[in-house]
């Protein structure tokens, strides 16, 4: 389509995507933390996972996730906060900037993305034979987590649909961060996978993002709040409006809508 916003989306993707050296440096720093954790008697094994490992991370906002598989402990199984505290106390011996959350211990680093250390118990196997975990959740509880299954779904769809699939995930994550994070990063990957599961090729970036919004609005992820639902509905309507304006030849109007959704990093120049 002449003068479509697609080129503008590619410029945004260049701005928000980590370069290969940046990604490798982040994973190397995570490996150093992983090796440190392996010296902690509570920890059995550590696995580097998450968006950085899956190449769906975005600049500025994405961290590296480390699953720290811990020894079975009845008290910790009843109260996930005890596991968080134990990991935090150990990491504080080495790292100066530590913050505890319900689900992870966050390490802030000055030279790149931070690291989230997530304590976990092994909870069985998924259908492919990979480990399932219990990880901390709100109110000191534990929830199921299947990182290997998520990795497999993302890679299968990336092979099926090309690099454009992961690009669409990055765009959706950037939108979420620019709008108060109505959908958690992990849920965004799930919605995107469900949206394009049966597609044979990806649409253009603006069409892919609008399709994602429609699916997220129709089948909202479990963790989306009432306010988040409103944000998603607004995004779905505005994205559809942006597509219609582009189809009518109003490229400038279309890009103004996308800029409202994606923030100031989205360029509005008409090519």
Residue ranges of predicted features:
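A generic structural motif
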Residues: 71-76, 198-200
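Conserved catalytic core of two-metal-ion nucleotidyltransferases
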Residues: 81-128
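A structural motif
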Residues: 130-172
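Generic non-transmembrane alpha-helical segments
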Residues: 29-42, 86-94, 171, 175, ...
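N-terminal regions immediately upstream of nucleotidyltransferase
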Residues: 1-48, 53-61, 74-78, 107
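Short hydrophobic/aromatic beta-strand micro-patches
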Residues: 67-69
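A short, glycine/Asx- and small/polar-enriched loop/turn
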Residues: 60-64, 111-113
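Conserved nucleotidyltransferase catalytic core and NTase-mimicking acidic/glycine-rich helix/loop elements
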Residues: 160-271
């Amino acid at each position: 389509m002449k003068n479509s916003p697609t080129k503008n989306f590619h410029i945004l993707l260049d701005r928000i995507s980590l370069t290969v050296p940046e990604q490798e440096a982040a994973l190397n720093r995570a490996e150093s933390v992983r090796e440190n954790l392996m010296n902690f008697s509570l920890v059995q094994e550590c696995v580097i996972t998450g968006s950085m490992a899956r190449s769906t991370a975005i600049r500025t906002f994405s961290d590296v996730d480390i699953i720290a598989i811990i020894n079975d402990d009845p008290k910790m199984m009843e109260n996930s906060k005890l596991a968080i505290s134990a990991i935090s106390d150990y990491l504080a011996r080495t790292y100066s900037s530590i913050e505890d959350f319900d689900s992870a211990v966050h390490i802030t680093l000055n030279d790149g993305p931070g690291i989230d250390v997530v304590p976990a118990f092994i909870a069985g196997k998924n259908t492919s034979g990979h480990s399932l975990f219990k990880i901390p959740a709100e109110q000191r509880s534990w929830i199921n987590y299947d990182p290997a299954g998520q990795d497999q779904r993302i890679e299968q769809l990336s092979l099926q649909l090309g690099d454009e699939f992961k690009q669409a995930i990055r765009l959706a994550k950037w939108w979420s961060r620019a709008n108060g994070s109505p959908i958690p990063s992990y849920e965004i990957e799930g919605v995107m996978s469900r949206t394009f599961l049966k597609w044979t090729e990806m649409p253009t970036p603006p069409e892919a993002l609008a399709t994602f919004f429609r699916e997220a609005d129709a089948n909202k992820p479990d963790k989306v709040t009432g306010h988040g639902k409103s944000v998603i509905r607004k995004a779905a309507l505005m994205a559809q409006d942006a597509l219609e304006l582009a189809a009518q030849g109003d490229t400038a109007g279309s890009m103004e809508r996308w800029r409202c959704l994606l923030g100031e990093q989205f360029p509005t120049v008409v090519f």
